[in-house]
């Protein structure tokens, strides 16, 4: 009887530790912007407990909105795809350690926010990246230019990673020189020197080959 009571006490202590760990993970997820449904799914806590944490932690109820179910948002902008690849690399590193799913996501997102200047993915978008690989919407493939592996939809003709795409987006189409980044407006295709050279060439043609 004493041994049975001892085992029951040990199991009770383990349950208490697991509950405390889940609560800590829930707090971290909420502070990073997770919705109540995600917190419940990742920690196993019931909805009433999770919902009760939002007001004291954030001063407001759980954010509304739906979990993404396609990759459309990521593919609308190359930089989003680039950031998704950063998140994927972090997941690969941290999933090798003996951590809970919630703990991995918390550490991945904190590392991602530290690495990039301006995070483009919120916690929900970041958590969906490994799922895109699991459901075979995205695949690992090698870039034809740099040879590095990246994730994304399978390309039918050639393969170029988001980093190389970003690189070539800001290189002169004529000479390959770097072009300064423009956050707004149309992207420049030529560097200043090539642009001026092209203008002079057009003027010569307009005047019958005579500069002036």
Predicted feature residues:
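Long, charge-rich, low-complexity intrinsically disordered regions
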Residues: 1-28, 32, 37-212
């Amino acid at each position: 009887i004493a041994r049975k009571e001892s085992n029951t006490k040990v199991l009770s202590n383990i349950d208490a530790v697991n509950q405390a760990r889940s609560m800590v993970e829930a707090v971290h997820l909420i502070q990073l912007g997770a919705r109540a449904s995600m917190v419940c799914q990742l920690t196993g806590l019931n909805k009433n407990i999770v919902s009760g944490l939002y007001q004291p932690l954030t001063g407001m109820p759980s954010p509304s909105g739906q979990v993404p179910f396609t990759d459309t948002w990521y593919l609308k902008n190359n930089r989003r795809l680039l950031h998704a690849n950063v998140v994927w690399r972090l997941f690969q590193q941290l999933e090798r350690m003996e951590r809970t799913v919630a703990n991995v996501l918390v550490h991945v997102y904190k590392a991602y926010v530290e690495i990039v200047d301006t995070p483009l993915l919120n916690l929900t978008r970041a958590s969906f990246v490994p799922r895109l690989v699991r459901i075979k919407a995205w695949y690992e493939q090698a870039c034809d230019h740099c040879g590095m592996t990246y994730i994304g939809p399978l390309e039918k003709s050639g393969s170029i990673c988001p980093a190389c795409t970003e690189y070539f987006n800001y290189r002169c189409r004529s000479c390959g020189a770097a072009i300064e980044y423009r956050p707004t407006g149309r992207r420049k295709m030529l560097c200043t020197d090539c642009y001026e050279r092209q203008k002079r060439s057009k003027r010569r043609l307009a005047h019958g080959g005579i500069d002036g």
